[in-house]
């Protein structure tokens, strides 16, 4: 049998906009004008920038823009392309949209890297497809994705906790970390006042104790650093994420801050040192996409980058609303029992509803109460991770998510009722310290506003969408 001559590589369209016309399997007849504006701006002004941020409002086709840029660079430069999402559910959603609606070949990477199929690994290593995975798959000690040409960060407004957690060692007072917490507390006793040490090591449950947050002065960290390293080395254990985090931080304790509360000790640098994480830093380009990008340097602080090129918001979109929301504040005039009765009545009228809570304790309480209502099904984070089809197909259902601002979207008739239950402003001890102890909440105003904007927008995903929001 004769050897076949390999065919020449197909020519790549000149721009991402031109690529859209070549996607013969797409179901969308054309790009929106706003999408075209962003793509042309990127091609003209940001093609060779190492860090690029683009902002598109909810419902304006941000995912398609990101996938077109990713697919175009994959074809044009034969680059391995990584598309990052905050959650597993969003990974599945993006891959489904890419393959079924946009005509872009995409591959989902979920679970342990040892579970990736040979075909999937080849798709990344040979730049055969757009590879979609979670933030956590890139930000770990030994990621599989170590040679990306381009990394696209979807929902970049939530990137901070996923990125900073890679260099954050959280020691909990209860559970498996109890012995380590006690040992570290004994070391910190030398540099803490008696009242602070009592709060840290005691079992105080008063509201004042629960609000307490503090930081060990940097000069004091220097004085106990060697003893602290020795104690943690002995007590950290041989398994679990704490050991891996300590491996990254151990030789850089003097560059870290130590934050304290009655339930947790957090050791981390103020800004995540992403320049030391080669799978992130060595990419030719990093693209950050969000519906809410601030101008105060918050994105740079979250990602550890000194400079990020921001593309202009498309003309005509700067002040456009994202659907209609009818806000209800029942606690202004009703007591606790009446609020619960109102909530149950609205759930009964709406059929499907979404509840966002501040923590797992509040979420479990809501789930318990809803299960007492006749004919209702409850869906938590795990139930929605693989997809939202079961929830959407139910006539009477409630989705309950704890401290979740992103990743779960319910456009149109999928859900018209949203409950926002006391969402917390701070998501970690560092944020709490700056807001509550230092009075520097101004630093986080954009971040807090972004979280609240994302929270109330879970059920209004387009200009013609609408929902009732109960706060």
Give the positions of each predicted feature.
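Conserved RecA-like ASCE ATPase "motif II neighborhood" in helicase/translocase motors
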Residues: 117-152, 158-166, 267-273, 399-408
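Conserved pre-motif I regulatory segment
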Residues: 2-55
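Conserved Walker A/P-loop ATP-binding site and its immediately adjacent core
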Residues: 60-102, 106-113, 136-137, 292-299, ...
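Beta-propeller and closely related beta-pinwheel folds
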Residues: 330-342, 375-392, 398
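Conserved coupling segment at the C-terminus of the helicase ATP-binding
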Residues: 47, 51-53, 57, 148-149, ...
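Loop/turn-to-beta-strand initiation segments
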Residues: 80, 127-131, 148-150, 283-287, ...
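Conserved RecA-like P-loop NTPase helicase motor core
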Residues: 390-471
């Amino acid at each position: 049998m004769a050897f076949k001559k390999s065919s020449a590589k197909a020519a790549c369209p000149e721009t991402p906009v031109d690529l859209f016309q070549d996607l013969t399997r797409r179901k969308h007849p054309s790009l929106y004008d706003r999408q075209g504006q962003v793509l042309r701006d990127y091609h003209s002004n940001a093609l060779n920038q190492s860090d690029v941020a683009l902002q598109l409002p909810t419902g304006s086709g941000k995912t398609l823009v990101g996938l077109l840029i990713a697919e175009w660079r994959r074809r044009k430069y034969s680059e391995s392309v990584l598309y990052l999402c905050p959650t597993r559910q969003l990974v599945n959603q993006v891959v489904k949209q890419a393959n079924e609606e946009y005509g872009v070949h995409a591959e989902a990477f979920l679970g342990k890297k040892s579970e990736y199929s040979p075909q999937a690994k080849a798709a990344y290593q040979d730049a055969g497809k757009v590879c979609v995975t979670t933030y956590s798959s890139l930000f770990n000690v030994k990621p599989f994705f170590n040679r990306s040409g381009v990394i696209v960060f979807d929902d970049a407004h939530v990137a901070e906790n996923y990125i900073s957690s890679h260099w954050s060692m959280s020691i909990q007072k209860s559970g498996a970390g109890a012995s380590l917490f006690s040992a570290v507390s004994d070391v910190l006793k030398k540099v803490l006042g008696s009242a602070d040490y009592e709060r840290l090591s005691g079992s105080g449950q008063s509201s004042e104790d629960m609000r307490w947050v503090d930081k060990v002065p940097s000069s004091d960290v220097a004085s106990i650093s060697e003893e602290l390293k020795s104690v943690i080395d002995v007590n950290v254990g041989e398994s679990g994420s704490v050991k891996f985090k300590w491996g990254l931080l151990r030789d850089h304790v003097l560059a870290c801050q130590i934050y304290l509360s009655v339930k947790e000790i957090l050791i981390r640098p103020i800004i995540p040192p992403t320049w030391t994480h080669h799978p992130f830093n060595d990419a030719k380009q990093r693209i950050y996409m969000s519906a809410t990008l601030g101008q105060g340097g918050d994105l740079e602080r979250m990602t550890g980058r000194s400079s990020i090129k921001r593309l202009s918001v498309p003309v005509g979109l700067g002040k456009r609303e994202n659907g209609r929301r009818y806000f209800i504040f029942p606690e202004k005039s009703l007591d606790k029992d009446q609020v619960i009765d109102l909530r149950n009545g609205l759930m009964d009228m709406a059929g499907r509803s979404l509840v966002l809570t501040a923590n797992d304790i509040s979420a479990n309480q809501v789930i318990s109460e809803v299960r007492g209502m006749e004919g209702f099904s409850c869906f938590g984070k795990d139930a929605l991770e693989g997809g939202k089809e079961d929830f959407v197909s139910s006539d009477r259902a409630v989705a309950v998510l704890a401290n979740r601002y992103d990743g779960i979207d319910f456009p149109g008739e999928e859900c018209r009722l949203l409950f926002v239950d006391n969402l917390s402003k701070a998501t970690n001890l560092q944020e709490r310290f700056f807001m509550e102890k230092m009075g520097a909440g101004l630093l986080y105003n954009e971040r807090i506003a972004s979280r609240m904007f994302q929270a109330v927008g879970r059920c209004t995903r387009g200009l013609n969408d609408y929902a009732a929001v109960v706060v």
